[in-house]
Amino acid sequence: MRTSPPFRADHVGSLLRPPALLRARETLTGDALREAEDEAIREVVRRQEEIGLQSATDGEFRRASWHMDFIYRLGGIGQATDEHITVRFHNEQGDIEFTPAALRVHERIRLNEPIFADDFAFLRDTVTSRNSGVVPKLTIPSPSMVHYRGGPAAIDPAVYPDVEEFWRDLSAAYAEQVRRIGALGCTYLQFDDTSLAYLNDPAQRAELSSRGDDAEHMHLRYIKQINAALAAKPAGMTITTHMCRGNFRSSWAASGGYDHVAEALFGELKVDGFFLEFDDERSGGFEPLRFVPPGKMVVLGLVTTKRGELESKDTLKRRIDEAAKFVDLDQICLSPQCGFSSTVEGNQLTADEQFAKLRLIVETAQEVWG
């Protein structure tokens, strides 16, 4: 088994909020809510350790949304409360919509203070106090998500008459975030990035083209900006990225394999590992993994978080073998395809089903890699 992240058995980040915490979010504020979150996080860290995971997150228990909670805290970005972003998600029963407030870049982008710093410090101290050797992991949205969610219309041309200045400021703010979080002791940081998966879907590219983006080449811009944000990452910090096609209340937003982005994504993005959604036919085949260079890790998201039904070990092992035809088995790890609760509402499965899936991942990884 691996002793550094990403681990053979790993997970993306978000976990179902306990009912008591959901009630607390409705009735408590300030210190009282923080105490309820602290209690829930201590317990979920214990559960991750008990299952046998080598990394632990705080389940994103303090967030309402995996990405917007972060993005709105960047200096220069605000909520356009009179307008909403509409993201349409799909499931077997039909369509549902996620409608956060739209964002506006109204000043030059900057990092006023490290975002989620107190949250990470609490997770770090909780993990350290247990003396289990588990590595605390922080997840944040990729810089790509600021542009993907807002688009050109969200950027005030009076602030950024030259869009290249927008990109430079955005990457600089993220670079400072990475540095400051590293100074707090973070050695495992993940950039969550649905955009690089969405761009494989022709319908998504058509939508970006309609708003004025160069959709066919947008993934190259996003890769460039992520690399700029990571150019001075702290020594000893592992950076991974997670990609999926949407995860809201057991629904998805996009479909398509990784073919459109694969060669540039795997060959040029300067991260240590890729968490990739592969739980059903929407994700395509494993053939794009042939572009993964030696030394980079691929975390196969073979276990779905969208349903409670437990996968079989034999099926997981067979699919790992299939992936190993395109990338060396020693470069492969195993995880769920996404988080279990990308937003506070969570996916449609129980906490017991969630933890059973994480336990299955640990057991399968032990049997495959020893």
Language-model features: locations:
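Domain-level signal for soluble alpha/beta catalytic cores
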Residues: M1-G370
